[in-house]
A protein has these predicted regions:
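Helix-rich interaction surfaces within compact, conserved domain-sized segments
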Residues: 113-173
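Inward-facing hydrophobic residues that define packing positions of alpha-helical scaffold repeats
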Residues: 29-31, 37
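Hydrophobic protein-protein interaction segments
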Residues: 55-124
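TPR-adjacent "capping" and linker segments in tetratricopeptide-repeat scaffold/adaptor proteins
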Residues: 1-6
């Protein structure tokens, strides 16, 4: 998928701090990464957006993908587009099928996690809805640092974009 931008390192390191419960250190690393990342202007299903990111603070300007049997973080600034097929069966509530368009105009078939990590273990009143990717709930792990549960939700300056309702995100390069 190419050489990652320098800001990916601090974003990955922040996950290690999340795992140990050191959310303040994770937040500082994420802030540094977000300051360095390029805003990703795009169109989402034909609507122009000045910026676009995953609503989950752990990810922000990256798209989690499975391509060729391997897990990748694809920086949105390194991508020309993401197209997703409409959900057709139960698998699509966990893995959204589609393809990414790379800067060299190569098209790569991908699976994108339709749910956030930990959703399968959800309990409580909305557990079934979360597991079925019908809703998204947010947990503020640290001031200003939000972790999602349930359906993946992309955010932009024009609103929210649930992954299962989104068909095409195009990024100009």
């Amino acid at each position: 998928m190419g050489k990652p931008p320098a800001w990916i390192g601090p974003l990955i390191e922040a996950l290690r701090h999340d795992g140990s419960g050191d959310y303040a250190a994770a937040a500082a690393l994420r802030e540094r990464a977000m300051d360095e990342a390029e805003p990703s202007a795009c169109t989402v299903d034909g609507v122009a957006c000045e910026w676009f990111a995953d609503g989950d603070s752990r990810l922000g300007p990256v798209c989690e993908i499975i391509a060729n049997g391997q897990y990748f973080w694809l920086p949105l600034e390194s991508c020309q587009g993401v197209s997703l097929e409409p959900p057709a069966d139960l698998r699509d509530l966990v893995w959204a099928s589609g393809e990414v368009l790379l800067p060299n105009e190569g098209r790569v078939p991908v699976l994108v996690p339709a749910r956030y990590p930990g959703t399968a273990e959800a309990t409580g009143d909305n557990a079934d809805l979360l597991k079925q990717s019908r809703v998204t709930e947010w947990h503020e792990a640290h001031p200003g640092m939000w972790f999602g549960m349930g359906q993946r939700l992309w955010s932009s300056d024009v609103g929210e974009h649930p992954i299962l309702d989104t068909r095409l995100v195009s990024f100009p390069l």
